[in-house]
Amino acid sequence: MPHYLDTATWARREVFEFFRGFDKPYFNICTSIDVTRLVELLRERGGVSVSMAYHYFALRAANEIVPFRYRLRGGKVFVHDVIHGGTTVLLPNEAFTLAYFDYVEDFATFVGGAGRAIEEARTGDGAFRPRNDDDGRIHFTVLPWISFTSFSHARNWGNEDSIPKIAFGKFARENQQILLPFSVEVHHALMDGLTVGRYLSRLEEMLLEPEVYW
């Protein structure tokens, strides 16, 4: 069940205390993820966008790697049982809004729910309503126009904003591979490069055989 972490006995206690007070305690890692198998299977299958699928796998991996469910609350570390998603949605007038959706392990159920949330955001009143008080999410953004190699996010909540932020870019082709630019930004008081490495390894592992998960 959701609970607060006992930081007094946490192996990272001193690291946590050190980075918690930084003005900018975030670090960002950019890489390229091989989505060749995912794209090929979805072309054969039809009916599901690649974007919807990579949101699912990025969120599933985040739920499996426990520190991605840590959040800072009043200087304490809160641990969510499950974290959900929110993503940017481009509007017809070229402004953007946000869509929020729940994580569900079943692929088809997730795609249905997230797809409805995104469509409702796209066809709604276009109002920009960020849920600043909802930290039980991963913040996603999609830039399908840019194969980026570096990325940083705008932030305005001081050093207590501990929600991981993930960006997806424009596919790039290299030899026979289809590569997805991928950025993950996290709070250093809550995790280190080792944690992000485990997250990326798990994500890559799932994307080698995505059909196992649907």
Model-predicted regions and their roles:
Residues P2-L5, I29-R37, E44-V48, A61:
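Aromatic-residue-lined binding/catalytic grooves and analogous aromatic/hydrophobic interfacial grooves
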Residues L91-F148:
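Helical lid/core segments from catalytic subdomains that handle acyl or acyl-like groups
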Residues G46, V50-A53, D106, F110, ...:
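Short amphipathic alpha-helical segments
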Residues M1-C30, S51, F128, D135-L179:
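Flexible, Gly/Pro-enriched loop and linker segments at secondary-structure and domain junctions
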Residues V48-G85:
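Hydrophobic "lid/gating" helix adjacent to the active-site nucleophile
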Residues R20-L41, V82-E105, L179-E185:
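Acyl/amide activation-and-transfer machinery of modular secondary-metabolite enzymes
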Residues F57, A61-I65, A117, R202, ...:
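Generic non-transmembrane alpha-helical segments
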Residues A108, E120, E160-W214:
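Active-site-proximal acidic secondary-structure segment that organizes catalysis
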